[in-house]
Amino acid sequence: QGNVTTAPIRSDDGEAEPELATGDLNILLLGSDSRALESDGFGEDDGTERSDAMVIAHISSDNTRIDAVQLPRDTLGDLPACDDNGRGSYDGGFGMLNSALQYGPACSVAAVEQLTGMTIDHFVQMDFEGFIGMVDAMGGIDVCLPEPLQDGHARLDLPAGAQSINGDQALALARTRHALAEESDIARLGHQQMVLSAIVQKATKSDVLVRP
């Protein structure tokens, strides 16, 4: 419906159609920090794009099991040289894993493959606006917070306890760092995992999957 675009997963793929999968699949999920919603208070667009969240989802060949591993975005390492179609090129160098996305998703794929030794078969990239729209289209998600959370930087203000949250609140919960005592990326991963788990639980309900 015009909301989904495709791109080669590797710089040398060109216009090749993806092959039909016959074995296990590794899919890289990228949450972009693109400031598409600058006017709504999500911060200024500094002209770059990084991955706020990175998850490798492994799907077994018989479709009976899905395992997910989250990668800390501040992971430091040697990023490989990369030529991404439509984004220019990167000569490689030492840097944070999340910075590879500014050169395009194929460069993020190359960086994750070098770090993990895994082969990534596909990727899915979503920005702030897409994430909010997805959660709202599902009718919100259910979470349970052990304590209230407030973070003006992420526009987060949630009470403690079980509650249903909308797309804006889910994004704020996944992004908050200042609401946590540690204010670290590792601490933030816990909230991202909570949000992702709630999305999966909501999406797998039969009444959600049959909605147009």
For the regions a protein language model found, what residue spans apply to each?
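Non-catalytic, solvent-exposed segments at the cell envelope interface
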Residues: 1-212
